[in-house]
């Protein structure tokens, strides 16, 4: 497959690039029934409009705290460029990206790849842990767009990669560097993953199991155990527990003084890392008498890009 012109699409969530984009971004997000079904199907979009209107002011203020918008588009574009460069010695690859809830969407990505003359497609999710709400929704949208455009090119999907060797090694290296900043003081490692409604897991979603697989593989390298918790819950449904704020309270009660927080389900910086972890949770930890430092997101770290390259190459071999 490597000699066949191949288009790689990185799939990610997307985010508002300016504060004026926040409300329409939220509308797009809550219009997706694969994340949160809002009553009968015909009520999904009207309710999404109301929720977006209500939440937009607070959400926009949050984005103002991290520079006025999400950096996810720029980071994902940089990841695509780095991956294409990494693949150059291995075949004829063109790499682009498609966001789920804010431009550029799948149709733009496909138009670009077709203009490059690709004959095969690889859809690589930038969510290492599969969930119907993330990778599942992105792949559904990709298939809809392919059908709408009447594109019948061979498609290989890479929906999850919780134990990919280079991904695991890159996080383990970041953890070791993070622990070194505490100069030998006892430090608790906390893995913070994005939360999901528990109904997803009860319906068979492998997200939590995939997350635990990643942590287990990381701990084999570091030799250090950590705690898993879940952040960013919203809405009146039951969410995965324990929540990250609750774990911070628990650690303070246990007398912990130092915390290294690892954004385990996030490979790129965005509002959940730059605001929730680096601002909210650091502030909470300080109030509780603890020092909290976070590991950086992988973004375009060389070893992480190597891992993405290996995923693409392995999928190419397997599909031949």
From Swiss-Prot:
E.C. code? 4.98.1.1
Protein location = Cytoplasm
Question: Could you provide one GO biological process annotation from this protein's UniProt record?
Answer: heme biosynthetic process
- Annotated binding of Fe cation, by residue: 194, 272
Q: Which GO terms describe its cellular component?
A: cytoplasm
List the Pfam families. Ferrochelatase (PF00762)
Q: Give the InterPro entries listed for this entry.
A: Ferrochelatase, Ferrochelatase_AS, Ferrochelatase_C, Ferrochelatase_N
Q: Which GO terms describe its molecular function?
A: ferrochelatase activity; metal ion binding
The catalysed reaction is: heme b + 2 H(+) = protoporphyrin IX + Fe(2+)
Q: Quick check: keyword Lyase in the entry?
A: yes
Primary location? cytoplasm
Keywords assigned by UniProt? Cytoplasm, Heme biosynthesis, Iron, Lyase, Metal-binding, Porphyrin biosynthesis
Enzyme class label:
lyase
Q: Identify the pathway.
A: Porphyrin-containing compound metabolism; protoheme biosynthesis; protoheme from protoporphyrin-IX: step 1/1
What HAMAP family does this protein's entry cite? Answer: Ferrochelatase
Q: What does this protein do?
A: Catalyzes the ferrous insertion into protoporphyrin IX.
Task: Identify its protein family.
Answer: Belongs to the ferrochelatase family.
Q: What is this protein called?
A: Ferrochelatase
List the source organism: Desulfotalea psychrophila (strain LSv54 / DSM 12343)
Quote the gene name from the UniProt entry: hemH
């Amino acid at each position: 497959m490597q000699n066949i012109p191949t288009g790689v699409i990185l799939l990610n969530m997307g985010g508002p690039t300016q504060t004026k984009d926040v409300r329409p971004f939220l509308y797009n997000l809550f219009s997706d029934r694969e994340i949160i079904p809002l009553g009968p199907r015909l009520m999904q979009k009207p309710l999404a409009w109301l929720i977006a209107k209500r939440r937009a002011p607070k959400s926009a203020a949050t984005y103002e705290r991290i520079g006025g918008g999400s950096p996810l588009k720029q980071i994902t574009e940089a990841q695509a460029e780095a991956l294409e460069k990494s693949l150059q010695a291995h075949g004829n690859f063109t790499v682009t990206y498609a966001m789920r809830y804010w431009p550029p969407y799948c149709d733009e990505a496909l138009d670009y790849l077709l203009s490059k003359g690709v004959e095969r497609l690889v859809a690589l999710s930038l969510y290492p842990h599969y969930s119907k709400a993330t990778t599942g929704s992105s792949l559904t949208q990709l298939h809809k767009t392919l059908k709408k455009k009447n594109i019948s090119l061979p498609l290989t999907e890479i929906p999850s990669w919780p134990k990919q060797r280079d991904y695991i090694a890159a996080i383990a290296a970041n953890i070791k560097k993070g622990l070194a900043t505490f100069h030998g003081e006892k430090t608790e490692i906390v893995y913070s993953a994005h939360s999901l409604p528990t109904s997803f897991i009860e319906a068979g979603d492998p997200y939590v199991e995939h997350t635990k697989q990643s942590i287990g593989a990381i701990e084999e390298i570091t030799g250090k155990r950590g705690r898993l918790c879940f952040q960013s819950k919203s809405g009146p449904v039951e969410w995965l527990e324990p929540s990250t704020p609750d774990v911070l309270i628990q650690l303070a009660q246990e007398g912990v003084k130092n915390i290294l927080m690892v954004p385990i389900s996030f490979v790129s910086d965005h509002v959940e890392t730059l605001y929730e972890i680096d601002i909210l949770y650091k502030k909470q930890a300080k109030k509780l008498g603890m020092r909290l430092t976070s590991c950086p997101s992988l973004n375009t770290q060389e070893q992480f890009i190597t891992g993405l390259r290996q995923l693409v190459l392995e999928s190419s071999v397997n599909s031949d």
